[in-house]
Amino acid sequence: MGLKGFAEGGIASIVAGCSTHPLDLIKVRMQLQGESAPIQTNLRPALAFQTSTTVNAPPLRVGVIGVGSRLIREEGMRALFSGVSATVLRQTLYSTTRMGLYDIIKGEWTDPETKTMPLMKKIGAGAIAGAIGAAVGNPADVAMVRMQADGRLPLTDRRNYKSVLDAITQMIRGEGVTSLWRGSSLTINRAMLVTSSQLASYDSVKETILEKGLLKDGLGTHVSASFAAGFVASVASNPVDVIKTRVMNMKVVAGVAPPYKGAVDCALKTVKAEGIMSLYKGFIPTVSRQAPFTVVLFVTLEQVKKLFKDYDF
C-alpha cells in the first residue's frame, strides 16, 4: 500500500475536520460546563450583624443551541472556527497516521482467499492504528482544545494563542515540552475506541449492505455505513473525551496545585460534583459532529480513492 493510504486518509480527514469544526468547538464548550469553581456571593440579611453567608450558585448548564447562540452573540461568527489551524495540524498528524496504518494492517490481516477480515481483527487493527496516531498528534490535540476553550475564560485569563504554532511554542516556554503530551493516555485510549469502533463499524456495515444486496456500492451505501459508524464511535468514546478535554484544558501555574492530579482524579471529581451522566456531557454535539464527520470522511475517502486508483506510490 505504501504512502497511498496515508495520503488518501489524510486528505479525507482534513476535509472532514474543517467542515465539522464548529460542531466540535460547541462540543468542547459543553464538556467544560460545570467545571469552573462555583460563583460565590456574600449575602447580608437585613437584620444580620457582622456575619456573612456564602451562597454557592449552581453551575449554569446550557444546551447545544444555547451554547452555539451565545458563542456567536458574544464572540462573533469567526469564533466558530477558533482553533481551526490546530484541527488541520491534528488531522494531518493523527488521522493521516491512523487511516494509513489501518489500511496497511487491514491489507496484511485480510484473508487472501476470501478477501474478508473478521470483526475482532478489524477492531484490533483500529486500536493499534488509533493508538499510534494519537501519540503522534497529541500536541495538536492539546493546542486545539485550548484554542477552542479560550473564549469561555475571563479576558484576564485567556491565553490568546495566535495560531496552533504559537500555542505549541507558548506551551513549551511556559509549561515545558511535556505539556504537549498532557492527557496523552486519554487521547490514546479515546483514539483506540474511536478508530476501532469507527473503521470496523464502517467496514462491517458496508460489507453487510453489499452482501445482502440492500444497496449498490455507491453514495447511499457509503453514507449509511458512515452514519452508523459515527454513532457507534460517539457512544464508545464520549466518557473518555470529556475527561480528556478537561485534563488538556486545565491551566497549570508554578507553585499552585493543578485542578486534577491525572485522568482518574479528573473522572472521580467530575462524577462526584456533577453526577455519572456528566461523562456523557456534550453527547448531542458529539453525535452531531461525529456522524457528519464520519460521513464526510468516508464519502471523501471513497472519492479520493477513485482519483488515486491509477497511481501507485
Swiss-Prot record:
Membrane topology: Multi-pass membrane protein
Keyword Lyase assigned: no
Taxonomy, superkingdom: Eukaryota
GO CC annotations, alphabetized: mitochondrial inner membrane
Gene3D superfamilies: Mitochondrial carrier domain (1.50.40.10)
Solcar repeats: 4-108, 117-208, 217-307
InterPro entries: Mit_carrier, Mito_Metabolite_Transporter, Mitochondrial_sb/sol_carrier, Mt_carrier_dom_sf
One Pfam short name: Mito_carr
Family listed: Belongs to the mitochondrial carrier (TC 2.A.29) family.
Protein's job: PUMPS are mitochondrial transporter proteins that create proton leaks across the inner mitochondrial membrane, thus uncoupling oxidative phosphorylation. This leads to a decrease in the efficiency of oxidative phosphorylation and an increase in heat production. May be involved in protecting plant cells against oxidative stress damage. Recombinant PUMP5, reconstituted into liposomes, transports a wide range of dicarboxylic acids including malate, oxaloacetate and succinate as well as phosphate, sulfate and thiosulfate.
Name this protein carries in UniProt: Mitochondrial uncoupling protein 5
